[in-house]
From Swiss-Prot:
Name of the featured protein: Methionine aminopeptidase
Keywords: Aminopeptidase, Hydrolase, Metal-binding, Protease
Gene source species: Archaeoglobus fulgidus (strain ATCC 49558 / DSM 4304 / JCM 9628 / NBRC 100126 / VC-16)
CDD domains, A to Z: MetAP2
Enzyme class name: hydrolase
Function: Removes the N-terminal methionine from nascent proteins. The N-terminal methionine is often cleaved when the second residue in the primary sequence is small and uncharged (Met-Ala-, Cys, Gly, Pro, Ser, Thr, or Val).
A GO cellular component annotation in the UniProt record: cytoplasm
Co-factor remark: Binds 2 divalent metal cations per subunit. Has a high-affinity and a low affinity metal-binding site. The true nature of the physiological cofactor is under debate. The enzyme is active with cobalt, zinc, manganese or divalent iron ions. Most likely, methionine aminopeptidases function as mononuclear Fe(2+)-metalloproteases under physiological conditions, and the catalytically relevant metal-binding site has been assigned to the histidine-containing high-affinity site.
Amino acid sequence: MDDEVREKLIEAGKILKQAVNEAAEKIAPGVKILEVAEFVENRIIELGAKPAFPANISINSDAAHFTPKKNDERTFKEGDVVKLDVGAHIDGYIADMAVTVDLGDNTELVKAAKEALEAAMEVVRAGVSVSEIGKAIEDAITNYGFKPIVNLTGHGLLPYLNHAPPSIYNYATEKGVTLEEGMVVAIEPFATNGVGKVGERGECEIYSLLNPRPVRMKMAREILKEVEENYKTLPFAKRWLKKAPDIIISKLAREGVLRAYPVLTEVSGGLVSQWEHTLIVEDGGATITTK
């Protein structure tokens, strides 16, 4: 990894850490979810980076991919378990970070995912198998009496690609990819008091450009032009676009031009906690860009 790339990764992480920590302090009962999402996204820009994807603010049994709609009036409530998962990039070099804010009495659930992340980061180094990382995560979560979510993973990060190989499972697998020096990875344990699996629910506000190709409708062409120019292959929120009629966005997703990211929720309705950091893999350890 050359010095310029490393500097951009570390700067993106530094900016993201500040923005996320400031945003987390604003999460409280009665506050609009949209207010926090817009704050953290705008703060990233103010500090000199760009959002790598829309702020995910998934609450209670929702684990991932919830972002508010334009003019969304929904608010945080007493008792909520709030996951704030945000990304920032500089010239496509991405940092990814998540924290959980507990507005109720779920201290142990929150600690389970946080300690799982700490345990996982302790074993990250060039030459380690992702199965060893998964075991560290699983052991930490099950020690608290909770379950890891088995179908959500940590992941690699590449320029303008926020989910790349390798997948880093939150449990011990029989085989696994070996981490290499210079890899950039996001480790994100999810803990739950449910059965440990997520499924899709209907709501979807996040999309990315999957297969750019000519389309007939004028407004569809305008949407794709805006997406290509501003977000490239990174995910975007419908509320970020000048115009985003549901019927056109849905049609582009059905046709495979856009990829949809529906909200993922714990299938048994269990509460979910999450913590995440981004790491540059090195010989003998790693640099955590978001800590």
